[in-house]
Amino acid sequence: MKVSRRAFIKQTAAAATASVAGVTLPAGAANLVTDKELTQLKWSKAPCRFCGTGCGVEVAVKDNRVVATQGDPKAEVNRGLNCVKGYFLSKIMYGKDRLTQPLLRMKNGKYDKNGEFTPVTWDRAFDEMAMQFKRVIKEKGPTAVGMFGSGQWTVFEGYAAVKLMKAGFRSNNLDPNARHCMASAVAGFMRTFGMDEPMGCYDDFEVADAFVLWGSNMAEMHPILWSRVTDRRLSAPKTKVAVLSTFTHRSFDLADIPIVFTPQADLAMLNYIANYIITNKKVNTDFVNKHTVFKQGVTDIGYGLRPDNPVQKAAKNADKVGDSKPISFDEFAKFVSTYDLDYTTKLANPDKSKEKEFKQQLQKLAELYADPKIKVVSFWTMGFNQHTRGTWANNMIYNLHLLTGKIATPGNSPFSLTGQPSACGTAREVGTFSHRLPADMVVTNPKHREEAEHIWKLPAGTIPEKPGYHAVLQNRMLKDGKLNAYWVQVNNNMQAGANINEEGYPGYRNPANFIVVSDVYPTVTALAADLILPSAMWVEKEGAYGNAERRTQFWHQLVDAPGEARSDLWQLVEFSKRFKVEEVWPEDLIAKKPELRGKTLYDVLYRNGNVDRFPLKDVDPEYNNAEAKAFGFYLQKGLFEEYASFGRGHGHDLAPFDDYHKARGLRWPVVNGKETRWRYKEGSDPYVKAGTGYQFYGNPDGKAVIFALPYEAPPEVPDKEYPFWLSTGRVLEHWHSGSMTRRVPELYRAFPNAVCFMHPEDANALGLRRGVEVEVISRRGKMRTRIETRGRNQPPKGLVFVPWFDASQLINKVTLDATCPISLQTDFKKCAVKIVKV
């Protein structure tokens, strides 16, 4: 029986889906798994390569090639289901333009900034790279070198990068692209609870009475989680779904309470709901009195723009953005009382002809939170986080759950959804941000630096105390010539970063700078670099991701990378061999540990008795491990166990390394072999003391903070010259910049190019028809696309939406590089543009 690969994928996926639904498939489908040809495949588990949901997949390998994938029925997250991107996982590694050897810009046999990309050996690539890094460190010091990493790094890669940059090069100029997606969530968690990441888990979905989406199109961005929400809504008819967004999208199809609002006005609506809860006497007084305190945050904090920007200069408190002062409950109640229904509607309603309907929906939404009998899960993603007041928005959604006590119990959860597969596990938990260390530690805290130096066996004072350049600032410093040696891994910031014409591309092509990009395909970012390093991806290496519900998942290396491609982990560790401590550390630091003199950073960081303590025999003999073979010890296990020591006993407990290869992921803290589903609640969280009920132990007093924060306008709004709001985002078929999904023929054909979604009346007013080519123009740049007046996304009048997956249509030429001043996360959801027919 011969079965085509396409038919096999389709039928096995159908079988997995059917088994979850309790459906029996025809014999032809069921018999596939017993076919002789198919039994030659080796199946192994792995988490999906795409979003932060953390779906489990089964991966089939034959002849050192991934030939099929299907949803893993044993995975708790997705229960055998895949979205359309996960369905085509087997194809993402095999694009025709896969990078397989290092490429250096050269002219006449030498490196030249303006030369052509030329194939070179790894030795030649690292020779040039090391020379450039050493030159910069010698001339300008460690603050002139930097790295931009990723929420797609494995846990091991991110941890190795933290050690290399913050300890080896003594530079905190390390930031992940998670700065663009999750920094506001992190800052919100830390300000309210003193600890990062959600207190709930996906198990909330099956017992909640209401779901509220704030700036989250789960139907397309988290479709597997949306299937669970949909199942709950349809199987429990009393369940309600509210969807709030600046435009109508596919998630609205399930909405009982649909609300389209004016950009930035979510701040006002959040305060209105808090006011509604208080005025209707629905505050959970016992919970609030025992477990919360109230603070008022500093206002008028600016927008993270360059200091000479007039809007930034006008801010009164740009130098104390995170400050706050204690207030009472009565003072908080008075503060939010301004946000009554009329005032909030005036700020938030984009369609004045539907004012009555808007008010009705807003009241229904407020009642979901206020009614003590209704268990509520709030979801949000980029609508909250990519926001010039993103940290505030996160704090304010917690206000609603804390005022009502709807938190940390099954079905009651404020749930920040993650965009990348390991934005939680790597960027946040490992601490690859410019101000962080592992397990919520920060470089500004002397005790935290001391702890890290102790674990890493380094001399006191190795880790700098000043935070480094964050993502947006890195681009500005590259342009200004203050950041000169720069390594980019697992991201495509030239397509993703805002205002790229003015603040991105100039820095990459600055003659004083040497830019290295490690990637699997020739992305926009790679083509702007001076050296391209070919990387292994996904199951071409052993890895670990941490998903949105604190679930850490491992996988084995299943196939070899093509050609000379090497994992980012191998690149980081191998590169460290080219630096002796004398070349990167001052003499007074070496004098504190003279036994390190003459050693390489590889010796100091990765052969320190911790990382190299697990021998090759610990590697599972059924699987290859390229890094273990290269370095002679089980590198991943050593890195993980050293990293895990930061969090064990501190509320971030991870299980022993080997447990993860056996399980379909475990949710931390894992104490005495048991994972934690709900944090901060007695009886569920082992860190909560008996008799306390709840304990928000990230804060010294064990209490969560309810913040009084106002509505503040965005830095740029539509006017006569630029009359439209621009919002950017993703679509179901593509992930981030499309560098993987656009190389899958089926996904490319499903949505080949980006378009400008526009209200039909706006299009008619401009004399535009569907399919007409236009320019989207802002004060910073312009790009060409085509108008779409139908389909899945339906903006209100006055707003356009353009997805950013298309490398041929760089919408980030247009966007504004304003940030939340607290989280330093970019606001990609609002700026002013005009639309002009070509």
From Swiss-Prot:
Compartments in which it is found: Periplasm
Keyword Nucleotidyltransferase among record annotations: no
Presence of keyword Oxidoreductase: yes
Binding site for substrate: W804
GO cellular component assignments: membrane; nitrate reductase complex; periplasmic space
Superkingdom to which the source organism belongs: Bacteria
Gene that encodes it: napA
Entries under InterPro entries matching the protein: Asp_de-COase-like_dom_sf, CT_Nitrate-R-NapA-like, MoPterin_dinucl-bd_dom, Mopterin_OxRdtase, Mopterin_OxRdtase_4Fe-4S_dom, MopterinOxRdtase_cofactor_BS, Periplasm_NO3_reductase_lsu, Prok_molybdopt-oxidoreductase
Record-given protein name: Periplasmic nitrate reductase
Quaternary state and interactors: Component of the periplasmic nitrate reductase NapAB complex composed of NapA and NapB.
Signal sequence region: 1-29
Organism field: Ralstonia pickettii (strain 12J)
List of residues binding [4Fe-4S] cluster: C48, C51, C55, C83
Bound cofactor: record note: Binds 1 [4Fe-4S] cluster.
